[in-house]
Every structure is written in C-alpha cells, then in structure tokens.
C-alpha cells in the first residue's frame, strides 16, 4: 500500500540501481565533450559506443532492476563475459550514464563512498515521498512500482541533474575540480535535503478564539522561515530551512518577515521577491531585496551562462565575462555582483535575467499611493547612498530643467578644463 501511495517506491534493487556508482557508466558519458549537442544525439552516440564494445548481446527479455545491477557488475569487472540485454535495458543504461543520481554524484565527487551516501539520501528525500512520486506519475502518465526507477532516471536526465549538481558544487566551493574539498561539498549537499515540515493553522471555527483547535499540515514546496518563539529547536529548524532554500531543491518558496533577517542571504537560487506589505522605511525595502541581490546571485549566473554557452565550467565563464567587463572599463564588481545594460545587449531582450520585485496592489487600495511614494523615497535613498540604479536616476531627472541637473553634477577629474 505504501509503495502505491508513493512512499518507498524506490526500494531494495531499484534504490540500489539508481544510486549505484559504476566506473563503466561514469566514463561512458563526458558532459564537456557533448556540450551543446541535442539530447537525442547524445543518447545515440553513447548507445553506439556501448554496442561497439562487443560486450552486449541483444535479446528479448524484461528489464528489471536486479538484472541491470548484475549487468553493471559485469561491466565494471575485468571479465569478457557476454551480457544478455534487451533494447530497453540498453536504453536504461544509456540514461543511467547521463543522469542517474549515483553516477552524477560519483562523476562530481570522484569518491564512491561519498557519492553512494549522497545519492541514497537524495533519492530517499526526493523520490521516495508521495508528493514527488505523484508529480512523476502525472508527468509520465503511469503508476507502476516496477517501472518507477526508469521514470526517476529519465526525469533526472530531462532535468540535467549533472549540470544542477555541478552548479551547486561551484556555489559551495568555487575552486577548480582538483582543488575542491569534496567532503565539504557532499556534507553541504546532504544538508539541503530537508525533511518534511509541519505548520500549525487555524480553522474558521477557532479563528480569533482564545482556545484554538489547530491543525497541523505538511509543508514541502513552500515553507515558513523563522518563528516567533526562537527556541534552540526553532533556530536549528530555521537554519535547516535556509540551507535547503539556498539549494536547487525544495522548498522553492520561503515565507519570511523583515525582522531579524539582517545578514541572511537567500540569493543562491532565488531572483524573485514578493512584498506582502509596503514598509514605511526605505532601508527596510532595500534590505529585503538585498537578501537576493548579492555576490554571484541566481540572475547573475544565468546571464553569465548566456554570454558563453559554449563554455563548460563556471570558473571559465566568469573569467571570460570579467575580461569583457574589464575591456569595457567596468569596475571589479562586474560581473560578480551586477551586470550593466551595456553587457546585457549581447543577450536577447526576452532572455535577460533580472531581480524581480513583485508588489501586489489591490483595486482602491491605499497601497497605490504608498508604493509611489516609496519608489520616490527609494530613489532619493539610493542617491544619498551613492548607489543609484540607472533607470531610477534618469527617472528622477526626467522632469527637471537642464540647468538644475547641471547644478547637481560635480567633476571628480584631477584637472578641470574650461571651455
């Protein structure tokens, strides 16, 4: 019953299969060599290489996780024994080479024990939950315990799990592959596989009453951050949620307040912020956006990746982008903290990435006037701090006479030449 409901759908041989670390499958696919190729071409190339090894004999037989595990053990051994396998089984091995969790972690970490542990916790946390299993059932329009492991592997291939893990590892440790601390990377990744969270809610019958009958609901994809009663347990839980949110995995929505958020960063995998209310303090609004507008934030990385789609490693992409920024005369904050419009011109306008600040304004609400006033105050606040946004700076000058604008400018050059 539990398997059908989604819990424990990956178990025994199927879990061992998707988390196995095979040298043969790891070496069968080199992401850098296939960079820019169509997925169909990549699969065809790997499959052709498999057939050229003369290790396989195609037969008609069902593809089970137990059989594939035995085949992989033979492939990793020195024996030349022929492996009887079906066309479907060969396709599954191809998919495993590209995106199986065990192979992807092994390719990244280069250590079987670390990769096996990380992949097992990843699969148990992501794919052995009923709500995630339901997503895959809907996506593949099939609910079967026997073929669930194939769907999981294909799902990881379609989502390019290898690229996801590579980017996450880069954010944890920016050094080149040979210099990285793989133990630290593995530990930080495991910390992001957060368990289910429970949230107490009021019912319509108990709302506003002193004696409340509260219900506990599970929260998965959206979670609250922080707690009014910051006990040690609540503090630890808040830290776990923060680490999970700063990862490519759930939760994808974080509900928080402005209180006590100074110094906290949520920029690794977030570029949108929705303001539930409009603060009267411009510094408060600035600090809210500052949580996701920081060093190598998500919108920065996405733009840098679009500058050089032919480049494989993140270090190389940022080095090339920095060289371009230097040639254009930009300071060393570019492209790590921000990317000027002049550099974004090389990207199609519809593909450019920005920080998105969403303010819901309801009809006939006083928030309309309050928001207009706040934008005006924010422009002046940034001017005062010496960090204006170009579009806001131009907006403040739009209705001013030219002679008044000249009075606001001052010359910082060492020699002032009069006309």
PLM region spans:
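Helicase-associated low-complexity regulatory tails and linkers flanking the ATPase motor
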Residues: 1-254, 258-419
């Amino acid at each position: 019953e539990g398997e059908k409901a989604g819990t424990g759908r990956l178990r025994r041989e199927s879990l061992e299969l998707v988390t196995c670390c095979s040298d043969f499958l790891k070496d069968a696919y080199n992401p850098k060599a296939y960079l820019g190729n169509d997925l169909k071409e990549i699969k065809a190339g790997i499959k052709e290489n498999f057939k050229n090894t003369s290790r396989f004999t195609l037969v008609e037989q069902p593809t089970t996780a137990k059989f594939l595990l035995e085949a992989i053990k033979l492939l990793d051994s020195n024996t030349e024994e022929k492996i009887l396998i079906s066309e479907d089984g060969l396709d599954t091995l191809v998919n495993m080479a590209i995106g199986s969790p065990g192979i992807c972690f092994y390719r990244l970490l280069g250590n079987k024990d670390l990769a096996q542990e990380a992949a097992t916790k990843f699969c148990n946390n992501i794919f052995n939950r009923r709500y995630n299993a339901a997503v895959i059932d809907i996506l593949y329009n099939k609910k079967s315990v026997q073929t669930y492991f194939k769907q999981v592997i294909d799902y990881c291939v379609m989502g390019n799990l290898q690229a996801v893990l590579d980017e996450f590892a880069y954010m944890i440790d920016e050094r080149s592959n040979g210099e990285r601390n793989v133990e630290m990377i593995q530990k930080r990744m495991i910390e992001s596989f957060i368990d289910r969270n429970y949230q107490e809610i009021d019912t319509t019958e108990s709302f506003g009453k002193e004696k409340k009958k509260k219900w506990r609901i599970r929260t998965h994809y959206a979670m609250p951050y922080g707690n009014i009663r910051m006990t040690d347990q609540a503090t630890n839980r808040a830290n776990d949620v923060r680490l999970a949110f700063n990862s490519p995995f759930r939760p994808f929505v974080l509900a928080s307040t402005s209180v006590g958020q100074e110094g906290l960063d949520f920029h690794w995998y977030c570029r949108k912020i929705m303001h539930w209310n409009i603060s009267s303090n411009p510094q408060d609004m600035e600090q809210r956006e500052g949580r996701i507008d920081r060093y190598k934030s998500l919108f920065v990385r996405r733009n840098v990746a679009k500058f050089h789609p032919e480049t494989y490693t993140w270090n190389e992409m940022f080095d090339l982008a920095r060289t371009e920024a230097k040639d254009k005369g930009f300071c060393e904050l570019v492209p790590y903290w921000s990317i000027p419009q002049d550099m974004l011109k090389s990207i199609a306008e519809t593909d450019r990435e920005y920080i998105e600040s969403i303010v819901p304004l309801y009809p006939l609400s006083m928030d309309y006037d309050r928001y207009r006033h706040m934008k005006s105050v924010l422009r002046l606040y940034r001017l005062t701090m010496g960090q204006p946004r170009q579009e806001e700076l131009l907006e403040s000058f739009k209705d001013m006479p030219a002679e008044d604008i000249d009075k606001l400018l001052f010359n910082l050059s060492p020699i002032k030449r009069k006309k």
